């Protein structure tokens, strides 16, 4: 539970910083997958967005999240299309995709953990009322940002997890060795409850 706006601001700032780093790493993994499937320009775009998001840290805002979300969705749709159309993947492609899958699962689990902290902060501030001048500028800023950016972060995490699990399952049908995703499914259930 959150006891003050000052605490909420600190928790949210830390969560945004962690989230920006995690999402940046996830975007780089998606770029690696795109690369393995010869989607070079899409991979380059995602890497640029990942670098931008990583540099933002706790200054990340909704527009940054929207941009990387749009680019990730477009690239993931192309990845999905390429995988479905592929009759056979080369051994190099299978190795690259398998490595990406192995990197993806634990990173997504930690991203869900960050989203859980965000969810706790979002629900914790509902009982705090409005911050006052004595709470400080960071608290006043957090009071404006938490109700909008917090749910966007949670939604992005849920959508990314569902897309990722779907892509891993598709990779598996193409002979790529992928890790078990049951932990992701159960953590996603916790996040959405």
Say what each PLM segment does:
Residues 63-191:
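Extended amphipathic alpha-helical interaction segments
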Residues 1-62, 185-193:
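Immediate post-signal-peptide N-terminus of mature secreted/exported proteins
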């Amino acid at each position: 539970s959150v006891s003050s706006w000052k605490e909420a601001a600190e928790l949210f700032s830390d969560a945004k910083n962690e989230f920006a780093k995690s999402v940046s790493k996830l975007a780089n993994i998606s770029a690696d997958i795109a690369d393995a499937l010869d989607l070079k320009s899409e991979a380059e775009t995602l890497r640029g967005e990942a670098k931008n998001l990583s540099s933002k840290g706790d200054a990340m805002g909704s527009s940054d999240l929207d941009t990387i979300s749009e680019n990730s969705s477009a690239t993931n749709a192309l990845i999905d299309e390429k995988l479905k159309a592929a009759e056979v993947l080369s051994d190099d492609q299978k190795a690259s995709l398998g490595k990406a899958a192995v990197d993806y699962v634990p990173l997504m689990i930690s991203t869900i953990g960050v989203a859980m902290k965000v969810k706790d902060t979002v629900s914790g501030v509902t009982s705090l009322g409005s911050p006052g001048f004595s709470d400080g500028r960071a608290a006043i800023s957090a009071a404006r940002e938490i109700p909008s950016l917090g749910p966007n972060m949670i939604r992005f995490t849920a959508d990314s997890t569902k897309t990722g699990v779907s892509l891993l399952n598709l990779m598996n049908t193409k002979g790529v060795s992928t890790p078990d995703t049951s932990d992701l499914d159960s953590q996603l259930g916790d996040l959405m409850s």
